[in-house]
Amino acid sequence: MEFEDNNNNNDEEQEEDMNLHEEEEDDDAVYDSPPLSRVLPKASTESHETTGTTSTGGGGGFMVVHGGGGSRFRFRECLKNQAVNIGGHAVDGCGEFMPAGIEGTIDALKCAACGCHRNFHRKELPYFHHAPPQHQPPPPPPGFYRLPAPVSYRPPPSQAPPLQLALPPPQRERSEDPMETSSAEAGGGIRKRHRTKFTAEQKERMLALAERIGWRIQRQDDEVIQRFCQETGVPRQVLKVWLHNNKHTLGKSPSPLHHHQAPPPPPPQSSFHHEQDQP
């Protein structure tokens, strides 16, 4: 009886060992399974259609993948006009857009370098150069000598001029001299200068007035100037300009009005008075 019990116990232990061995083999099978990328379907790991806008950085600029077609473009230098308030044009020098926040936030549309919106930066689209097919000319007939093709002149690539601060052109100061007015002719646009012409009487009266008031118009002479302008028909501004222009020429030269004849010398005393004075 004891021998049979021992055999039964041995059989049970062997069965338990076999079960443990099978469980270990199952664990090894789990570890030896293919990686997750092989188990999952390919459509779940790779997406060929992108909706919306995604951004990727690095590689010479901030790249944005837009739309389902996969068009990619980068945002380069900032083109915002910083001198628009003064009527000029100047940029801040930011050469590349760098987002100031995480994608999906408002700060992602703001540049961390210059603080401007992303729309102010130049959007650079990828350029794909497609070389046109080269058509070879047909071979020349026998006995025909072909001259070499002339070297075609290729103009140098146009270089964009540097950005400069464009200020509004200064307004041309108008001459306050009404004697020298200019008017454009109707056809050719050539300006012809007109000078105010004075009569001889007006010149004499202006010269006399100038010597009287000292070649300057002062406040105490307002009544005299106003009466003179009414009598002669010369505007006040024209008279003022005439005094300024002729002060150094006519003011120094002796006036013809002052060329008075010298008074005659006194007559000589008669000898009659001298004889009376003598004792």
From Swiss-Prot:
ZnF (ZF-HD dimerization-type) ranges: 75-124
Subcellular location(s) per record: Nucleus
Tissue: Mostly expressed in flowers and inflorescence.
Stretches with biased composition (Pro residues): 134-143
Residues with site note (Required for DNA-binding): 243
PROSITE patterns named among the record's database cross-references: ZF_HD_DIMER (PS51523)
DNA-binding segment(s): 191-254
Pfam families for this protein: ZF-HD_dimer
GO molecular function: protein homodimerization activity; transcription cis-regulatory region binding; zinc ion binding
Keyword Disulfide bond belongs to the record: no
Compositionally biased spans, kind Acidic residues: 1-30
Keywords: DNA-binding, Homeobox, Metal-binding, Nucleus, Transcription, Transcription regulation, Zinc, Zinc-finger
Main location, first listed in the record: nucleus
GO BP: regulation of DNA-templated transcription; regulation of gibberellin biosynthetic process; seed maturation
Protein origin, superkingdom: Eukaryota
Signal peptide location: none
Function noted in UniProt: Putative transcription factor.
Note on domains (UniProt): The homeodomain differs form the typical one by having namely 4 instead of 3 extra amino acids inserted in the loop between helix 1 and helix 2.
Protein name according to UniProt: Zinc-finger homeodomain protein 1
Gene that encodes it: ZHD1
